Amino acid sequence: MTSTNEIRRSFLEYFGSNGHDVVPSAPLVPYNDPTLMFTNAGMVPFKNVFTGLETRAVPRATSSQKCVRAGGKHNDLDNVGYTARHHTFFEMLGNFSFGDYFKEQAITHAWTLLTREWGLPKDKLLATVYHTDDEAFELWKKIAGLPEDRIIRIATKDNFWAMGDDGPCGPCSEIFFDHGDHIWGGPPGSPDEDGDRFIEIWNLVFMQFEQTAGEITGSLPKPSIDTGMGLERIAAVLQGEHDNYDTDTFKALIAASESLTSVRAEGDHKASHRVIADHLRSTSFLLADGVLPSNEGRGYVLRRIMRRAMRHAHLLGAKDPLMHRLVPALVAEMGAAYPELGRAQPLIEETLLREEVQFRRTLSNGIKLLDEATATLGEGDKLPGDTAFKLYDTYGFPYDLTEDALRARGIAVDREGFDAAMAQQKAAARAAWKGSGQAADSEVWFDIAERVGATEFTGYTATTGEAQVVALVKDGKEVDSAMAGDDVAVIVNQTPFYGESGGQTGDAGTITGGDGLVLAVSDTAKPLGRLHAHNAKVQSGSVKVGDVVRLDIDVARRDAIRANHSATHLLHAALRHRLGAHVTQKGSLVAADRLRFDFSHPTALSAEDIAAIEAEVNAEIRANEVVTTRLMSPEDAIEAGAMALFGEKYGDEVRVLSMGRVADKHYSVELCGGTHVRALGDIGVFRIVSESAVSSGVRRIEALTGEGARQWFVAREDALKNTASILRTTPEDVEARVTALMDERKKLERELAEAKKALALGGGSAKAENADEDVNGVKFSGQVLEGLDPKDLRGLLDQAKQRLGSGVAVIVAVNEGKASIAAAVTDDLAGKVSAVDLVRAGVEALGGKGGGGRPDMAQGGGPEGSRAADAIAAARAVLTA
């Protein structure tokens, strides 16, 4: 067993055969912790289980979790490519016990897998324990037979884990592999522990204590186990390598970049190939999990990683964009373990190509400035912070990219100066991730949830029902009662009201009770994802905790929401059929009056695309197939072809919605907890009313169904009828009538233009000649023409020159308050009088500037058409100067 894929499979099979639920990797965007930028450890998906907010049917689990560390306090980006073990993307192998087995079995599993299953030499392994954890110390002696000098007590926080200042915590035991005395370094806890001889390969966390404000306050009633082993590290050990980048997966990716660049991964180029291989993994997996490059939050970190890799591609001399051409090699290596890579491959390649083309322009300008700024700097010098900031602010060069670019030359960057320059601006591109967090009153919901548990939702089959009030929240605090006029959130033990989630708006309706109680529910929220909070105003009577009440949803509103929600599923399927499998949902709004659907696609949809998609959805609606619902495990549902939305929280049992038919398969199959129509015909009709961009690579469709669509059609039919009445024709003939009117208008415009030209000639040569005068021995013709198109001025001046024989002609055309002036000089006067001088004098009189042309023909204009006569006079005055 040598390949990384075999090691991953072996790990999961071992723990699966030992009673652990094999759990697929969660997405890189955490669904249960908005304070985290990315999933950065194997235990993140199980955080709520460890804290008691969730329970699992099987108390043991194992996974190979995708992780990214490139933002926040867990940021390995700067070191990637220059060390043997730093990565932005890695896989964390882990086994977990939720109140089941504890230290002895955890150590037994670890030792058995490493030495018996994988055959690692026992004399190459040693363990650390927290300095007061005598139990773990003795277990290592008993189970592994390790001598005491290879069980090292560590007193630092490295061997004690805590989930913040409050909550579960406990000691750790780390397993190290000794690469041999030919490599410098000492064992953990020694002065030389930072060397590379002894490498941590597995961390066992024993969650056994409860702490408050950083102080241990007692023992957990059900101690738990959380372990983590970096797949890349153990692959290096099992493949006989000391460097993670020498393992099979990285070798394949580096070989691909060597082939495409014709540059070997040696010497100064070694780090660049490693950076590209690592960053290819993180960027591709982030894109596959729905993160798109942007200038803030997760998207900004993704763009930083992309650009760092692309700069190293530039260092390798790549003449054309490189990153997108490496994606097939990554899919070949990891696509079997992570099918989402293959599904998203077109989107990954197109996004990488677009970003690299854009960044190559940025890079060219930035590198030029950087070279100029460092021309006089040598090893040990510092680049001024304001220069680094200019690179960032003007050329899009992140600070770490500048720092990385200067690393090889031994030039540092003045970070304090950079920060000072940054503070002077309100730029937020590099703002630290703060997460969305919970509302300010989130603690009250935690208190209620712990006391009463989750609200039971009955709304899939019912629109009314009775329930008991279990909590009331007013102004962010729990209250015992509420009176008429109060705004209050009502929590009951069971409800038919759908709480806003998954893009679907919450239900509205009424809550009634004894003694004339009436509450008008405006919407229903879903705090913590478990409670249903009915936001209501007490219209009459009073409500108190413990009351039995009746709940009635607004059925007409619910029906409209259901139609719109089912239509989004059909729309999603139609988009994928028409545009490709790269289309994934990026967001949605399902309201009573409309639906909005955001999806991944790089370009605007054509009119043909929109028409085809709309027609396909309506065909499914007319077929009126029954919508089927099945409850399944998430794994079975996905295996059966259901589309799961990454980032959505799915429980042990999910609802699988199947709609329509294509051949012998359902048209749409998705995991969804929302409310839907019983048959597709209930949607009525589907109409797309707009398609637009949301952000780079994300498009938005807004649409109407049912009554909303009917009203939309009626409004347009009324507009057509009114237009027909105005045009004195029938609705059927409006197009022909408008076409005829437009043709007639064009004809009249041509006739008008000819008439204006004729008028410009004074209605005949006699009138034009009457406008001629002698000015300082030069024949001068000056005319002001209302409504003349400026483009006709030259033709009129040519005619005037022919009439004059020898002389100067000036014409001012006035249109909508503005004026255009043009002047012409006959050839015999070209050396004496300049048309440019005449025009500039006239332009100044018209309140304008400039004017130009040739000595024999010039033109200009100004905003003050009322001064047209003054412009003629100013031009005439030039001849007397």
UniProtKB/Swiss-Prot annotation:
Reaction(s) the record says it catalyses: tRNA(Ala) + L-alanine + ATP = L-alanyl-tRNA(Ala) + AMP + diphosphate
GO cellular component: cytosol
EC number of the protein: 6.1.1.7
The keyword Ligase appears for this protein: yes
Cofactor(s) of this protein: Zn(2+)
GO MF term set: alanine-tRNA ligase activity; aminoacyl-tRNA deacylase activity; ATP binding; tRNA binding; zinc ion binding
One BP term from GO: alanyl-tRNA aminoacylation
Binding site for Zn(2+): H565, H569, C672, H676
Gene3D superfamilies for this protein: 2.40.30.130, 3.10.310.40, 3.30.54.20, 6.10.250.550, Bira Bifunctional Protein, Domain 2, Threonyl-trna Synthetase, Chain A, domain 2
Database matches in InterPro entries: aa-tRNA-synth_II/BPL/LPL (IPR045864), Ala-tRNA-lgiase_IIc (IPR002318), Ala-tRNA-ligase_IIc_anticod-bd (IPR018162), Ala-tRNA-synth_IIc_core (IPR018165), Ala-tRNA-synth_IIc_N (IPR018164), Ala-tRNA_ligase (IPR050058), Ala_tRNA_ligase_euk/bac (IPR023033), DHHA1_dom (IPR003156)
Entry keyword set: Aminoacyl-tRNA synthetase, ATP-binding, Cytoplasm, Ligase, Metal-binding, Nucleotide-binding, Protein biosynthesis, RNA-binding, tRNA-binding, Zinc
CDD domains: AlaRS_core
RNA-binding among keywords: yes
Cofactor note: Binds 1 zinc ion per subunit.
Subcellular compartments: Cytoplasm
Principal cellular location given in the protein's record: cytoplasm
Family that this chain belongs to: Belongs to the class-II aminoacyl-tRNA synthetase family.
Free-text comment about domains: Consists of three domains; the N-terminal catalytic domain, the editing domain and the C-terminal C-Ala domain. The editing domain removes incorrectly charged amino acids, while the C-Ala domain, along with tRNA(Ala), serves as a bridge to cooperatively bring together the editing and aminoacylation centers thus stimulating deacylation of misacylated tRNAs.
Reported function: Catalyzes the attachment of alanine to tRNA(Ala) in a two-step reaction: alanine is first activated by ATP to form Ala-AMP and then transferred to the acceptor end of tRNA(Ala). Also edits incorrectly charged Ser-tRNA(Ala) and Gly-tRNA(Ala) via its editing domain.
Name this polypeptide is given: Alanine--tRNA ligase
Organism: Novosphingobium aromaticivorans (strain ATCC 700278 / DSM 12444 / CCUG 56034 / CIP 105152 / NBRC 16084 / F199)
